Amino acid sequence: MALVQPHGGKLTPVLAPKEQRAELKAKAEKLPVIRMSSRESSDCLMLGMGAFSPLTGFMTQADYQGVIDNMHLASGLAWPLPVTLAVTKDQAASIEVGQELALVDDETDIYVGIIKVADKYEYDKVKECKATFFTDDADHPGVQKVMSQGEVYLGGDIVTFSEMGYATKYAGYYAHPAETRALFESKGWSTVCAFQTRNPLHRSHEFLCKIGNEVCDGLFLHPIVGKLKKGDIPAEVRFECYKAHMENYFNPATIEMRVYPMEMRYAGPKEAILHAIFRQNFGCSHILVGRDHAGVGSYYTAYQAQEIFDEFKPGEILCQPIKVTASYYCKKCMGMATEKTCPHTKEDRIAISGTKVREMFSKGELPPLEFGRKEVLEILTKYYQSLEK
C-alpha cells in the first residue's frame, strides 16, 4: 500500500530552490515591506515547505469567507482556519492589486518571502474569533493576536526564500512533507500515526504514542517548535526531552521524529483539524487526538476536538483521528490506563498532564516517576533550576 495522498492531491511548496534564493532576497530588499507577526511568519514557513498544501499563499476573500462560514475553501476542499496576512487601513490604502511586496519578520527583521497581491479586503475581527476560537474572550491568546492585528487582509500567492534558521537549528530533525514521505516509504510504512505535542512527553503521552504505534506501521512524533504562549516550555528544552525519551523508551525501528515551525493558535477543535490536514501532507494516515487537543484554559469541552471530525464527510480528510480518552497512572493496575479500560476509582488514579507537571516544577517540586521518565525529569529539573538563578 502507498502513503495517503496529500490534501488536494499534490504537494504545493513555494520555497524557492536554493540556487534562486539569493536573487529573490535581493529583489525583495528593493520592494515595499510588510512586517509580519510571528504567526504570519510561521505560516510563511509552513506554506514554503508545502505543509499547508494546497494553499500557495495567504487567503483571498473567497477562501477566507468559506473557511469562516463552513470550514471549506472556495474549491470545496476542507480547511478549518484562516491563513491570512493583516495590514492596517493606512497601509492598505497605498497597496494595489498586482503589486509585489517583501514579507519581513517583525521580530527578527529577516526577509522571508515575496507576496503578489491578488486581493485586499476588510474583515470582522469578532466574527473571525468566534468562528475560529469559539470565543471572543480577550484572555484567549489567539483572540489577543487577532484583535491586535491590522483591519485589512492581503491575499495572494507567495514565494519564500528563507526558513529563518530552523533548518540549521534543528539539523537532521527539520523536514519538509516531501522529505518525510520519502523517509516513510524507505522504511516500508504505508500507515503512519502522527503525535502532535507542545509539551515534553510525560507518561500519558508515551502511553498514547504506543497505542498509535501498535495500530500503524510507524509513529511520527511531530513536536511544534514555533512560538508558544508565555509559560510554555521553550522548544530547545523540549527538543532535548524528546530525544531522551525516544532513545530510551521507543523502538527506533518504528518511530521517527521531526519538528515543524508553526505557531500555536490554541484553536482547540479547529486546530485539531488543521493538524490532521497538514499531517496528511507529511504522509500520515492517522493522528492521535486526545483530551482537549490544542486547547487552552477551559474554552473547549474535553473531547470537542474529537467530535469536530464528525462534521466532515468521509474522504474529506484522509488523515483520520485515533480518538483516545484521558489516560492516567492507576495504582491498582500498577500502570497506565484510560477511562475506557480501567474499572478503578478516582482515588486510585494519578492524573497526569503537562500543566500539572509545569506547576510542580514551578513550585520546586519534583514530579514522581508515575508522571514522567527519569531522563526527561532530569532535563526539566535543570531547566527550572536555571530559571530560579
Swiss-Prot record:
GO terms for biological process: hydrogen sulfide biosynthetic process; sulfate assimilation. One of its GO terms (molecular function) is sulfate adenylyltransferase (ATP) activity. It comes from the Bacteria. It holds the Pfam family PUA_2. Pathway: Sulfur metabolism; hydrogen sulfide biosynthesis; sulfite from sulfate: step 1/3. It is an enzyme of class 2 (transferase). Keywords: ATP-binding, Nucleotide-binding, Nucleotidyltransferase, Transferase. It catalyses: sulfate + ATP + H(+) = adenosine 5'-phosphosulfate + diphosphate. Its EC number is 2.7.7.4. HAMAP family: Sulf_adenylyltr. Belongs to the sulfate adenylyltransferase family. This is Sulfate adenylyltransferase. It comes from Desulforamulus reducens (strain ATCC BAA-1160 / DSM 100696 / MI-1) (Desulfotomaculum reducens).
